[in-house]
Design a protein with these regions (language model features):
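Conserved SAM/AdoMet-binding glycine-rich loop
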Residues: 1-93, 98-100
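C-terminal accessory regions of radical SAM enzymes
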Residues: 91, 106-206
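Catalytic palm subdomain of template-directed nucleic-acid polymerases
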Residues: 103
Length: 206
């Protein structure tokens, strides 16, 4: 986590990087809790043009399951800080995990509400949960078939074709209006298994 370094270290790096290379750079794998306005100002002066970070979910229950060091309160604060730098860098990318067998539809709706509520601009990258042998999360799964389905699959661009996954993916294209988010939820709530074509049609028209 590059941003975990203290402000003096980041200032020294930023000045040297700008003077010696003149290049632009992107930070990936950033811990949302390390996003601070002063640090962002320093790094943008040094050439930072984008940040990518794992938000994983907008549900505190799911973040706890993943043993993430942050909760939605910290994620929201990070998004609010980054939104202050719109126009100074490319919209940040927030990475979300889907196809989680421990996650309920309500958890997914919390993620959608979270994305709807935080300030833009931002983009969303979706990753299908992949169980890795020997990890703590895999050990919690009782059904081997569930694990088998998730092992060795392509975790990018292969999430399940469900209405809620498509709903989340809208945020990868645009930040829809509050009205549209509420309307779509009202249209599919309780009928998620049958609404994939409907959300797909909406997505194609955006």
């Amino acid at each position: 986590n590059f941003l975990g370094r203290d402000l003096n270290t980041l200032t020294e790096f930023s000045e040297k990087f700008r003077k010696e290379t003149g290049l632009k750079f992107v930070l990936s794998g950033t811990n949302p809790a390390s996003i601070e306005e002063e640090k962002m100002e320093v790094l943008i002066r040094g050439g930072l043009v984008r940040i990518k970070m794992g938000f994983e979910s907008g549900s505190d229950d799911v973040l706890k399951l993943f043993k993430r060091p942050v909760r939605t309160k910290q994620l929201r604060r990070a998004a609010e800080t980054l939104s202050k730098f719109r126009g100074k860098m490319v919209a940040p990318a927030f990475e979300m995990i889907v196809d989680n067998p421990f996650e309920s539809n309500e958890d997914l709706y919390r993620t959608i509400e979270f994305l709807d509520d935080i300030p833009g601009p931002f983009t969303v990258s979706m990753f299908s949960l992949q169980f890795m042998p020997g990890t703590a999360l895999t050990e919690e799964v009782d059904d081997f078939k569930t694990v088998e389905e998730h092992i060795d699959k392509e975790y990018m661009f292969s999430y399940k074709p469900t209405a809620i996954n498509l709903f989340v993916s809208i945020f990868a294209i645009i930040k829809p209006s509050h009205f549209l988010v509420k309307l779509i939820r009202r249209m599919i709530a309780g009928r998620e298994d049958n609404c994939y074509p409907l959300i797909k049609n909406i997505l194609y028209k955006l």
